């Protein structure tokens, strides 16, 4: 069992969001990072394409926002888009300061084009951007004395007292017990395995959303699930994701008859 029962913050999920959350918290806080995996598999680690950010002279925040809103078909949260676009360059700088080395072209960061972007603004580390990102963050986590990273521990319930989340119940091997904290952050990723076909790893089962809903949290926008259109499928093997950068560089989607199944979406 985990030796300490009382923490300042418990972070559930050890993908990019959970790892970065731990690093951004003050070093004065005792942080427990719970990872249901014993291996290093995660959706973040499997991410291929890259990180979109305005860094070129021929680009702008307005263009990036316009592309995003157009791709969202008018359903985007405008404030969220504005935050995403304006804070992206600073996040890229932060990652570089942490030691992430993006691909270079001449004397500047290399950029590629992905679907819906009108400018080349996707920074990458070959086709293993997610892996590079997670490895940099994990290295920093392991060197933080205020952070304990526990693998193979699964959160089964949130502890709610007076309408506040004050801890979690965990399944740790054969042991089921409660851990208290002043705050809990759920960073458990998506729910690809709610569907028959997915390129997500097995732990992408929507557990974080279920935990929050069961605890009484308001859940919204569950209908917005991204369906990635390109994967490689072999009989008896899991689906292998084919990067979105493929289409950004000019590849087109066609069925066995050479017809486009997404023709009606071309305006977006």
Identify what each model region corresponds to.
Residues 74-75, 88-92, 116-119, 208, ...:
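Short amphipathic alpha-helical patches
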Residues 40, 53, 77-84, 122, ...:
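Short secondary-structure transition/capping motifs
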Residues 65-73, 117, 189:
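A short small-residue
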Residues 71-111:
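Rossmann-like flavin
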Residues 25, 49, 94-121, 125:
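Beta1-alpha1 glycine-rich phosphate/pyrophosphate-binding loop at the start
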Residues 74-78, 108-135, 192-196:
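Helix-loop-beta segment of a Rossmann-like dinucleotide-binding subdomain
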Residues 1-66, 104, 126-268:
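Residues forming the flavin
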């Amino acid at each position: 069992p985990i030796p300490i029962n009382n923490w300042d913050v418990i972070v559930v999920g050890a993908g990019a969001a959970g790892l970065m959350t731990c690093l951004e918290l003050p070093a004065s806080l005792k942080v427990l990072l719970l990872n249901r995996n014993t291996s290093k598999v995660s959706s973040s680690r499997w991410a291929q394409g890259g990180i979109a950010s305005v860094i070129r002279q021929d680009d702008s925040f307005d263009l990036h926002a316009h592309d995003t809103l157009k791709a969202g078909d008018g359903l985007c949260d405008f404030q969220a888009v504005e935050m995403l676009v304006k804070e992206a360059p600073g996040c890229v700088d932060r990652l570089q300061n942490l030691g992430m080395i993006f691909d270079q072209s001449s004397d500047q960061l290399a950029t590629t084009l992905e679907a819906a972007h009108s400018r080349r603004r996707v920074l990458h580390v070959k086709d293993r951007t997610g892996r590079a990102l997670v490895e940099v963050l994990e290295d920093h986590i392991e060197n933080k004395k205020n952070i304990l990273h526990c693998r193979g521990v699964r959160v089964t319930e949130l502890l709610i007292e007076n309408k506040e989340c004050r801890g979690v119940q965990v399944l740790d091997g054969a042991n089921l017990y409660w851990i208290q904290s002043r705050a809990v952050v759920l960073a458990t990723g998506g729910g690809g395995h709610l569907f028959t076909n997915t390129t997500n790893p097995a732990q992408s089962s929507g557990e974080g959303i279920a935990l929050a809903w069961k605890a009484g949290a308001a859940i919204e926008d569950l209908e917005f699930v991204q369906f990635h259109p390109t994967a490689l499928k072999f009989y008896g093997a899991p689906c292998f994701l084919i990067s979105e950068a493929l289409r950004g560089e000019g590849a087109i989607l066609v069925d066995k008859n050479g017809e486009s199944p997404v023709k009606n979406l071309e305006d977006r």
